[in-house]
Amino acid sequence: MDRALSTFPGDDDETNERNINHREKTSGEHGHYEDKLLDLSEEEPNMIKIKNDIKKIINERYSNYISIDDDEISDILKDSFISNEEMQIKDFVLRLLVLEKLFQTSVKECNSLKNIIKRLENHIETIRKNMIVLTKKVDFQTGRSTTL
């Protein structure tokens, strides 16, 4: 037996239909999809220099906060906005405004989380103090301690 038996009748037919549909979507000997991904090995020397500059800036200024690898930098550089020959001022300003709004929202959320964490720390400290008082009361009532 070179294949597993199906649990329900008709499962084998569905599997065969899926294989036929898969073959229709693919092409070539190895069954690769027709849509080709961008080949990163054929990058322009200018892009390699830009990638190295980005890495250098991040390592010098932001190494404590973020780490970035080549794939992430390549994804950033593949943006159609960057690859355009002519830059539209309106598009540039709109992107800056969106980034500014995202940054403001992130800072606001960070401050909100900071306040929540501070409140939780205060609650935990109150619970800890009350647990110590309760332990002393139990010890006094059971006769293990003579002082409160």
Swiss-Prot record:
Lineage, opening ranks:
Viruses, Varidnaviria, Bamfordvirae, Nucleocytoviricota, Pokkesviricetes
The region annotated as signal peptide is: none
Under the subunit heading, UniProt states: Homotrimer, covalently linked.
A single GO CC term for this protein reads:
viral envelope
Which residue intervals are annotated with compositional bias (Basic and acidic residues) in the record? 16-34
Keywords attached to this Swiss-Prot or TrEMBL record, sorted alphabetically, are: Membrane, Virion
Q: Which Gene Ontology terms describe the biological processes this protein takes part in?
A: fusion of virus membrane with host plasma membrane
The protein's matches in InterPro entries, at most eight in alphabetical order, are given as:
Chordopox_Fusion/A27 (IPR003436)
| UniProt-annotated location(s) | Virion membrane
- Location of the region described as Disordered in the Swiss-Prot/TrEMBL record: 1-34
Family named by the database record:
Belongs to the poxviruses fusion protein family.
Q: What is this protein called?
A: Putative fusion protein
